[in-house]
Amino acid sequence: EYLWQGGEIWQGQSPLLFPIVGRLREDTYVLSGKNYRLEKHGFARKLPFFPEKMGREEMTLILRDNALTREKYPFPFELRAHYALREDGFLMQFRVKNTGDIRMYFSIGAHPAFRCQMGDRVVMDRTENADAFRLDKDALRGQETEAVFRNSRDIEITKEIFEKDALIFDGIASGGATLMRRNGRHVHVDFGKAPCLG
């Protein structure tokens, strides 16, 4: 079992975060003089996607804007989530299309939750020198950083790492990371050139 199956601590397994990743101050933003409320990680994870293409080993699901989304996010859009089984893994790809005429602001993120145990390790593809931002008391990205990678590639999973919630990195050099289980099994995640990693 590689993915977290949900439980008391966290019900999610692998939500798609859109049109924001993280939280806004007071869950509110202003656009063209109007206030909009948008909850943590946006609304896509809580809405039904509809099949666009279905195959034996892959599928594409689509979410289009509707009256409910426009109350929180006044942009017309199409969000496609493509999933495919591969011989050596599983592929997730997301595409966002602005179907309107005005500039559309958004962020998107994958949030797969892998089952791990204390003592497992996360090993980056490349040697890193990176500090991590932590969440502040309002669950917003704080300004303070802490040293995580110093000419190193790996982090041990400990309770202390999660005391302040997520580690948030900007500008990681690696394009992927591997969760190395103590039992020898592993999961590799390729995140390409994602500008932020949490």
Which sequence ranges carry the predicted segments?
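Short, hydrophobic/aromatic beta-strand segments
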Residues: I102-I108
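Short, well-ordered beta-strand segments enriched in hydrophobic/aromatic residues
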Residues: E1, Y83, F90-N98
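Extended, loop-rich substrate-binding clefts of extracytoplasmic carbohydrate-active enzymes
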Residues: K34-E87
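Residues that act as N-cap/strand-start positions at coil-to-secondary-structure junctions
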Residues: R23, F43-R45, F75-F77, I108, ...
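Active-site/ligand-binding surface loops and adjacent short beta/alpha elements
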Residues: Y105, A113-A194
